Amino acid sequence: MKHNFHTHTTRCKHAIGTDEDYVKAALDGGFDVLGFADHAPWAFETPYVSHCRMLPTQWTDYKQSVLALKEKYRGQIDIHLGLECEHYDKYFDQLLRLRDDGCEYFILGCHFLYSEENNPYVGEINHLDDTLLRYAEETVKGIRTGLYAYVAHPDLYMMHREEFTPVCMEAADMICQAAKEAGMPIEYNLLGLLGEMTHHPRGYPNADFWQYIRKWDNDVILGVDAHDPAQLRNEVVWDTAIKRLDTLGHRLVNHIL
């Protein structure tokens, strides 16, 4: 069975293709399960408008579109409605309301510390050791809520780091120990792997990270992190990820629901 629970839509402002294009591509790529997990529609306290996620007013359209595709393609592929989101203490209740309104699952992808409207993208500041540890702390807090299904790109912090330093090890230990204790998978991110294989490296998946964290024996799930339907047809990237993880001795899982 081939599952992917990390699929975006154009509502996030940095993806291409229609929602149905992703479903058709998933069928072409041999997927049995496709989960849409676009960036969460945070309702910020300030007038700030995000450049990288749907607006709160787009949630209903997103939900209705995914559910309509779920019915249209029933019997061909199982489709699920989810969101990728950070853990923000002050906005946590918004996720509970989205869950009550039909969101089937959340994946924990920490892109901003504390709140997007007041802080830069973590990939650009995690070269600073204190920021990296705060990133790890916030990720651990999210894990311990029990709300999220898995941790997306846990090694995102290597984006602007050239060496896997002792602080990087400490952050990895914090995240992977918490995920292990919670029985929560961590994601091997295929968008990052695609970048590496096409000479546009993003810094993750990071080989040193994945070798180092083997000691925690985490469950690992593949996430296409699709922002283009073509990514779901790319079997070379998928197969490469499986081979790498198998070589390192990681245990793959493919379901969260």
Pin down the residues of each PLM region.
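An N-terminally biased module of ancient metal coordination in phosphate/nucleic-acid-related enzymes
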Residues: M1-D89, L98-D100, H160-E170, M174-I175, ...
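Short aromatic-enriched loop/helix-cap "lid" or pocket-rim segments at secondary-structure transitions
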Residues: P47-Y48, Q94, N119-P120
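Alpha-helical scaffolding within the catalytic cores
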Residues: Y91-L95, P205-N206
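Domain-core and long-helix interface of multi-subunit machines
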Residues: D101, I107-W216
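Acidic, metal-binding active-site segment of PIN/NYN-like and related structure-specific nucleases
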Residues: I221-P229
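Mid-to-C-terminal alpha-helical segments outside catalytic/metal-binding sites
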Residues: R233-L257
